[in-house]
Amino acid sequence: SGLPEEEPADACTPDATTLCLQSDKFNIGVTWRDFQNRTGQGRATVLSNQSGDFWFFNAQSNELIVKIINGCGSTGSYWVFWRALSNVEMDLVIRDTATLQTLTYHNPLGYNSNGHLDIDTIFRCDGSGPAAETIDTSVDLPAPGAPQRIERTDPALIGPCAPDGDRSICLQNGRFRVQGTWSDFNGGSGYAHLIKKNEGSGYAWFFNGNNYEMLFKLVDACSYNGNTWVSIAGLT
């Protein structure tokens, strides 16, 4: 009768702790608990229509990246890819605002979960999936040991860091240069397109600027163990 239609009660509304992806179809949040039994909610940042991330303790230190891809034409469901850069306890909760289905990924305290690359989720495109599911990520991905050094470059051969478009970025006030390359199953290869978020972290995409493939961060832990920590989370 001329009155505007009300927004559905369950429509996703983005805020400081809520990430809305796929044109607000999915409502995403994460809660955490650390080793001192402190708890909180992740702080959300939207990166694109299908990608976003969360930080827990410091805005310069991102802890989790998530993306949701419409895979209806391939597997008949929406795909959920996420990775974490923390070993605190966390629950990543994803809710489909259209079907009201809820998918929860649980990471126990002390497990450095690398997350999940899930192409067969409960979010079936025809709405036929179960109402809820909880996945314990520690079952498939126990805490790893010391990271393996892949390659080391003589510091004498490295000059001052200078950004080069999106092929090379500088972090920690120019101390570190970040570059990336990729190769696929068909023999294709190329440079990663890098995006600097802040002095401690950034992202990379390979094929599509809306499809983030990697989160990386550097943490100054010199006062703890004399090192700068390097963490990388891939979504591919």
Show where each model-derived region lies.
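Polar/charged low-complexity regulatory segments
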Residues: 2-236
